[in-house]
């Protein structure tokens, strides 16, 4: 568990504060992390809306929105930290800065984001070293993406760990859609 003095935690705290202030007045950002979130803000906000459809953006508490924006950026666009770390950190930030229901709201929304096709496709592209545009649902791993059996097996192991799920041993994975369907149905 990270301490309150952990530099990564402190950086996230500053980024949340930056994003909070930015939501009221688009001012100069002081952290690289917040700058990266804002560069991807349109896409991040689309995922925020999708993860909490019962709340329009303008109805989400600005503190919760700032935490969600940061965590969604880290989960979908940055992906340098394991998902569990990102979600745990976001929940901790919600406990520090948010209201009574903030931690459960943040945790629930981020749990949905983990399994979104947009994120799974980015993970597949990164793992296979393929262009994201080539990772369509119809793409055949071997024919279209030139993946070997070992690369496909490694990808499945990565996704199992990343998404806390288990692909059945008899599950035939031929296309990207096979993975997306399984993740959606699990």
Language-model features: locations:
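N-terminal interaction/assembly modules
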Residues: 1-103, 108-115, 122
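Conserved alpha-helix in the HATPase_c
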Residues: 154
